[in-house]
């Protein structure tokens, strides 16, 4: 079975050669089932690999065909998965039978190189292991017109710590980008300053970029000691700059870690509490 680190397909197309291969430490989930719902109108929705497979045993990471519940999805929705061992992108499409049975089917494997983009035949979703602590992209064409915009993730709750490698920038790029998807904690949202992650190795100027429904990003900046989200708020007709000293990655969602150029890759440890 291939072990796949996950990263956003659309962003990689725009920033090819800025991504370095990532590694991860596999955690063994407990026998506690977790469920989280993400409601969003975003067509490209970054989701966290926040749960393990609903099974016991030492090889209990989630698979591409098991993490995302299909009841609120429609035929034609696609899941994009980056395989760091092969450097290729697995694309899975959702198919639904007349009886309502839904199956993730391999659509294609996309290969991106300096020579352009090529497409190969894909492999089964059940054979693609999702790396805990990273993220994946769910593409839902026309989601804005759907009555139900909720995506449900389910699986076994992780315990202990998960190690994720943050990629360095390469070439002339200002940042190296890694899509991180924190394990879903019992408290819900993942607090960046709450001690759940060891930020040893992070540097002033690093950013975490949270996707918004309109396709833009909200930026959280690292000051050297903590993460702060800066935003503007209307105050008596004036737009004033505010700061949030307790920024979070919403439960079940993934976010880009943008590593400032000139700094090496490093590991972060995500602790589930």
Label each region the model flagged.
Residues 6-7, 112:
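General helical structural elements
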Residues 182-240:
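Intrinsically disordered, low-complexity segments enriched in Gly and acidic/Ser/Thr residues
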Residues 79-81, 92, 138, 208-210, ...:
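Fold-core signature of tandem repeat domains
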Residues 15-16, 116:
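Residues in and immediately flanking transmembrane alpha helices
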